[in-house]
Swiss-Prot record:
Binding site for ATP: P122, T123, G124, S125, G126, K127, T128, L129
UniProt-recorded Gene Ontology molecular function terms: ATP binding; ATP hydrolysis activity; ATP-dependent protein folding chaperone; protein dimerization activity; unfolded protein binding; zinc ion binding
Residues at which Zn(2+) binds: C17, C20, C39, C42
Family that this chain belongs to: Belongs to the ClpX chaperone family.
Purpose: ATP-dependent specificity component of the Clp protease. It directs the protease to specific substrates. Can perform chaperone functions in the absence of ClpP.
GO biological process: cell division; proteolysis involved in protein catabolic process
Domain ClpX-type ZB residues, every copy: 5-58
Subunit structure: Component of the ClpX-ClpP complex. Forms a hexameric ring that, in the presence of ATP, binds to fourteen ClpP subunits assembled into a disk-like structure with a central cavity, resembling the structure of eukaryotic proteasomes.
Record protein name field: ATP-dependent Clp protease ATP-binding subunit ClpX
């Protein structure tokens, strides 16, 4: 019945840790190697030593490589078109966050709080791309979570701690690395409280999720199953401290501009009709820049959650000119990506100016922003990309407005031959 008696080796001798000298019944576990043993306490001590050395090495190595806000913004400019105000806000917030990690342990007098970020902007305005680019620039683990799939613990759906598990997966379960990562929570506006009044029924995907997320964002020790998860339930859970993980939450917040306008109208004293007319002339981007915490609370975010998102950056709706620039200018612009694909077939592709304008117009009509540009171009080039590998001597493909509108086929230019239409 009682299993507390010390186990013995094959020769009936007690086994001892080769490092600290404790016997096997003085420790929880004794791990055997070729003619040596190590106990769980010594393993933990070794882990602590390695962890401290890694932190010192990371802090000393990164301090000289942390880009300044100007440098961060310059790199964002290479990948994201427009959104200058949001880039400036993000550059400062991210710089301060990682500077805080480097200097946090060196200053005992002042404790620097974490500044999580809330991005507000329409679909396809670049919220996710900004967060992805920041993580790539800083070389830190990055994961995206969809707030609409999250529920409170115990209900059908994803538990909020699954977010940390995804972050761990991105860095091969390196806990130290994960604890300095970036988490982007998309569609955060979809978990707003359903009404201003507290509900009698359980709101498992709204306020409840906000409360659960709040714990992660504030900083908690999250228990995450190791690799293998449920397949190996006997494994001990990994403990991840979320205090230094940067959370960036993004959402379209449809209807928020109306709340802001209503608040602004109430603020006017007299001449209300004149104030109203001035308010109505502002663009959605200008209105959103005037957002206050009370507007977000009225929208449905709980006050505690809003309080943990001190940095708010608003993104403008992209106009046709911005979409054309997105197609052509960024480092990984779509036209450059398709040009590379065609190069692999020893062929060039030319997008004429009117074609880019037609693609941008179509994206504006679909209200998909920059997100819809790729699918439009994929549809336009589908037949050409299907036929091209089977065709010989095609040196160039020309796309113009009529091709985008579906009124004509792309123009194919052959080597040492007369130009032909794709329909020939």
């Amino acid at each position: 019945m009682n299993n507390d008696k010390p186990r013995r080796g094959d020769d009936d001798r007690l086994l001892y840790c080769s490092f600290c000298g404790k016997s096997q019944h003085e420790v929880r576990k004794l791990i055997a190697g070729p003619s040596v043993f190590i106990c769980d306490e010594c393993v933990e001590l070794c882990n602590d030593i390695i962890r401290e050395e890694m932190q010192d090495r990371l802090s000393s190595g990164k301090s000289s490589h942390l880009p300044t806000p100007h440098e961060i913004r310059d790199i964002l400019n290479q990948y994201v078109i427009g959104q200058n105000h949001a880039k400036k806000v993000l550059s400062v917030a991210v710089y301060n966050h990682y500077k805080r990690l480097q200097l946090g342990k060196k200053n005992d007098d002042v404790e620097l709080s974490k500044s999580n970020i809330l991005l507000i902007g329409p679909t396809g305005s670049g919220k996710t791309l900004l967060a992805e680019t920041l993580a790539r620039l800083l070389d830190v683990p990055f994961t995206i979570a969809d707030a609409t799939t999250l529920t409170e613990a115990g209900y059908v759906g994803e538990d909020v701690e699954n977010i940390i598990q995804k972050l761990l997966q991105k860095c091969d379960y390196d806990v130290e690395k994960a604890q300095t990562g970036i988490v982007y929570v998309d569609e955060i506006d979809k978990i707003s409280r359903k009404s201003d009044n507290p509900s009698i029924t359980r709101d498992v995907s709204g306020e409840g999720v906000q409360q659960a997320l709040l714990k992660l964002i504030e900083g908690t020790i999250a228990s995450v199953p190791p690799q293998g998860g449920r397949k190996h339930p006997q494994q001990e859970f990994l403990q991840v401290n979320t205090a230094n993980i940067l959370f960036i939450c993004g959402g379209a917040f449809a209807g928020l501009e109306k709340i802001i306008r209503d608040r602004s109208k109430k603020g006017g004293i007299g001449f209300s009709a004149e104030v109203k007319s001035v308010e109505d002339k502002r663009s959605m981007g200008e209105v959103l820049q005037a957002v206050e915490p009370e507007d977000l609370i009225k929208y449905g975010l709980i006050p505690e959650f809003v309080g943990r998102m001190p940095v708010v950056a608003t993104l403008d709706e992209l106009d046709e000119a911005a979409l054309i620039r997105i197609l052509r200018e960024p480092k990984n612009a779509l036209t450059k990506q398709f040009a590379r694909l065609f190069e692999m077939e020893n062929c060039k592709v030319e997008f004429r100016e009117d074609a880019l304008r037609a693609v941008a117009t179509k994206a504006m009509e679909l209200k998909t922003g920059a997100r819809g540009l790729r699918s439009i171009l994929e549809n336009v080039l589908l037949d050409t990309m299907y036929d091209l590998p089977s065709m010989d001597h095609v040196s160039k493909v020309v796309i113009d407005e009529s091709v985008v509108k579906g009124e004509a086929e792309p123009l194919l230019i052959y080597e040492n031959q007369e130009t032909k239409a794709a329909s020939d």
